[in-house]
Amino acid sequence: MALLQISEPGMSAAPHRHRLAAGIDLGTTNSLVATVRSGSAACLPDAEGRVTLPSVVRYLENGGIEVGKTALSAQKTDPLNTVSSAKRLIGRTLADLHQNTHYLPYRFGDNQRVIELHTRQGVKTPVEVSAEILKTLKSRAEETLGGDLVGVVITVPAYFDDAQRQATKDAARLAGLNVLRLLNEPTAAAIAYGLDNASEGTFVVYDLGGGTFDVSVLQLTKGLFEVKATGGNSALGGDDFDHRLFCRLLEQNGLSQLNEQDSQLLLSLVRAAKEQLTTQTEARIQATLSDGMPIDTSISRAEFHNLTQHLVMKTLEPVTQALKDAGVGKNEVKGVIMVGGSTRMLHVQQAVATFFGQTPLNNLNPDEVVALGAAIQANVLAGNKTDGEWLLLDVTPLSLGLETYGGLAEKIIPRNSTIPTARAQDFTTFKDGQTAMTIHVVQGERELVSDCRSLAKFTLRGIPPMAAGAARIRVTFQIDADGLLSVSAQEQSTGVQAQIEVKPSYGLDDGAITRMLKDSMDNAAEDMAARARAEAVVEAESLTDAVNAALELDSDLLDAKELQQIRQGIADLQGRLKDGKAEDIRSAVAKLSRSTDNFAAKRMNRNIQRALTGQSVDNI
């Protein structure tokens, strides 16, 4: 029995009219737009028959803007006003790029929150640059299809964080596009291959693009695409292979510093050489620099492979981790899908084939497969698809949680949870009379907040004054289909509420996610010990506060010996808090608790007597 469909909010359910939707692969090097026509997905060409649009934008003196091939051809002569690889900059800060800015031929601004590029038309951000690319693709699609697009699906690397995803949506909004969904690039590839070939089983999507690397382990069955695990590196791609070849060229010719024009010239030449080496055993680089210095260098395929083999091996580290996360052995993988133009490099194909012991799948164009999958997804979300429906389940790559008293990280949504999702958990106050609570949202696998990544903070105010532990605050985490997080907190008795959309103003450092996962495994034992101690400290401080408050009110119930015994227990406990282990602290807590049992009984009797004073038997 086929499942009934429920359209997304704002989507028309009218079945009789085909609604124009498109899939966009917003790439580091090239971008594409595709759509479904007559039941088949296809990339849309420009007026000259080219489906790929170079992701390059040039700002002209007359106020005009060039996008694509014409802009690309001007990189050598007008590097400061010609921006490429904006995808590597979007949603990031200068601090994230500290390792590679020296070979990027741009004039960066000093803004520490958002990357700014100085051009002849003023300051431009990566969001604005990306918007120009999206505008061009939008125009191409609407001219080809003969109508306005109702929406688009835009693909992003699976390892894009909230800031990078939100920045991508901002670029689409500037371009006048309605984003139906952001779709992870490996997932888009799986959609294209799964639907075309009706494949079932466990597949790995190996996606090496111009600026990013992603890997996804997917379980494909009839009607269900489930992402079992993801991994990757948001700062590893074909550009890094170019950079190694670029540095080698500088070394061979005794060059240390170049002006922007010469940098762009040599970068374009090493990219061309890299592409030649996929079909030729040797490539030659010839140029004349602006100072008249001639460059004439040859590089063999073997030399290029040796120069960049460490980058290829670097991609296999997250592949290994993703397989481990999914609980899948290499021998259980039915097929490996190669995505991204950088997978055309022969030593990449050879390394992947050796690792998995099988030839990777490549019957779809690796440059187009992501856009095709996005087009298929857009067609479904626009309400055009009527048969053979399937379900897509994506996952979040890192755990999300919040800080609890004592600096502990409480995980609300574990890593590799299927999204979209929503989860709630109840929390309470730590102090008597507490009327506000700070919600600190964190990301990571470690047990202590200090070892996790801080995402956002907000404050819930208006909590009714109560005894510690009496209030009930429900915190809800929601991740939408684009992987964007919103967090809300509500006090249950009054309904007072606060919430926040998590939009960090900065991205993760290069390889940060991989490091976070590795650190969580390497430090698991130490983290659990630290958490146990922190929990013991919280318990000790709570008991100490309660006993001190009771002594202020009712110490007259105790004789000198009892009072001294309790005060000594408090002192012993405070001493253990300084450098004692978790078991030492808990032992001192138990000792203090036992010493106050008689005191607690006396206080209860007094309170009962106070409650009964002046009451008649009939009223009891």
From Swiss-Prot:
GO terms for molecular function: ATP binding; ATP hydrolysis activity; ATP-dependent protein folding chaperone; unfolded protein binding. CDD domains: ASKHA_NBD_HSP70_HscA. Transmembrane segments: none annotated. GO terms for biological process: iron-sulfur cluster assembly. Pfam families: HSP70. PANTHER family: HEAT SHOCK PROTEIN 70KDA. Chaperone involved in the maturation of iron-sulfur cluster-containing proteins. Has a low intrinsic ATPase activity which is markedly stimulated by HscB. This is Chaperone protein HscA homolog. It comes from Neisseria meningitidis serogroup A / serotype 4A (strain DSM 15465 / Z2491).
